[in-house]
Amino acid sequence: MGDVEKGKKIFVQKCAQCHTVEKGGKHKTGPNLHGLFGRKTGQAVGFSYTDANKNKGITWGEETLMEYLENPKKYIPGTKMIFAGIKKKGERADLIAYLKKATNE
């Protein structure tokens, strides 16, 4: 399991420009991530997803996020997320630890 505080810093640097995590948070360029764990791809209410995201059919969890965050466009070809990914496994683990906490508060 990663470090929540390090993960928060990564989120602020790399994700917060496009995503919010708090309950009732607004969608930005990307969807609000509250309730992410256990949710299927392309299911945040009120966000306009690509068919690629809607049709991927996986459920977000630690393993799926670990793979997705390494290279989003490879994992879901056709996603509109314009983020190259996080190559370092430790950084992805930290970010996932933060997301697991922050999207469930």
Curated annotation (Swiss-Prot):
Q: Which residues carry this modification: N6-acetyllysine?
A: K73, K100
Stated name of the protein: Cytochrome c
Q: A cellular component term (GO) from this record?
A: mitochondrial intermembrane space
Q: Which Pfam families match?
A: Cytochrom_C (PF00034)
Which PROSITE patterns does this chain map to?
CYTC
What stretches pass through the bilayer?
A: none
Phosphotyrosine modification sites are: Y49, Y98
Record's family?
Belongs to the cytochrome c family.
Reported modifications of this chain: Binds 1 heme c group covalently per subunit.
Give all cystine bridges in this chain.
Answer: none
N6-succinyllysine occurs at K56, K73
- Gene Ontology molecular function: any one: heme binding
Where, per the database record, does this protein carry N-acetylglycine?
Answer: G2
Q: Name one GO biological process term.
A: apoptotic process
* Localization per record: Mitochondrion intermembrane space
User: What keywords are annotated for this sequence in UniProt?
Assistant: Acetylation, Apoptosis, Electron transport, Heme, Iron, Metal-binding, Mitochondrion, Phosphoprotein, Respiratory chain, Transport
Its annotated function is as follows: Electron carrier protein. The oxidized form of the cytochrome c heme group can accept an electron from the heme group of the cytochrome c1 subunit of cytochrome reductase. Cytochrome c then transfers this electron to the cytochrome oxidase complex, the final protein carrier in the mitochondrial electron-transport chain.
Keyword set includes Heme: yes
